[in-house]
Amino acid sequence: MSGRQIIGIHGLANKPEEVELAEFWHSSLQEGLEKNSGINIDALPFTSVYWANVLYPLPDTNYDAYRPAPAGALKTYEAGTLDSIRAGVGDVVGNGLDWLKEHFNLGALADGVLEAKLNDLSRYYEEEAIRDELRRRLRNTLLDHDGESIMLICHSMGTIIAYDVLRELGRARPNFRVAHLITIGSPLGMPHVKRKILQEWRTARTPTNVDRWDNLADKRDPVAIDVYLRGDYKANGRGVEVRDDLIFNDWGGINHKSYGYLRCPEM
């Protein structure tokens, strides 16, 4: 896989040590390739962009370690089996968490994730030094692999950081390209996030430097409140549109875990 690079950026809340999280992502991707496609690659060309230590002074020690999926657990999404109508989504700020709890019957686990999301998002948007550092880490990693065929996989809040960095690079480095952008469990459809994007970039569209954009979402994932981003983000000037794909996240809990997304058949 010479000349190709997979770059991953994690999402909300605190995380385990940097090396450990990278190993968990790598193992999840390997498992998905082997079980879903019969492809066995010992060492994927994978680089992890880690930013949890900007927001949290110490790594998380009470975390979900990667574990292989039970036999038969990795399934494609079957239309209708998980459907629940999510219409009229309100803004997830202020009492937005109460709105989500009332309409989607979210339990305590989902509450905690959403509260972490709101806190992390608030700091990203309100504290310039934090925002600049998170963007810098991803931007530098992307530019380190300029000229290679880059697959950029972003989870949760990492999709917001990635979107902003790609829009920045579209202006600053017009020849830079990402061959494949994959957003998983993304909050890019949240009204509050879309407003911030419009405030900074004036338009919501596929970044000009992206050749392909796939958005994977589980309808049970409360962070991916809007599973269909195509209606929110226009095509770029080369006609590249976001392609939405519903998936079945086998991890359980609130079905937001990155490992479940990374090993799903649609990935």
What are the residue ranges of the model-derived segments?
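A basic- and aromatic-enriched beta-loop-alpha substructure that forms the phosphate/nucleotide-
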Residues: 54-102
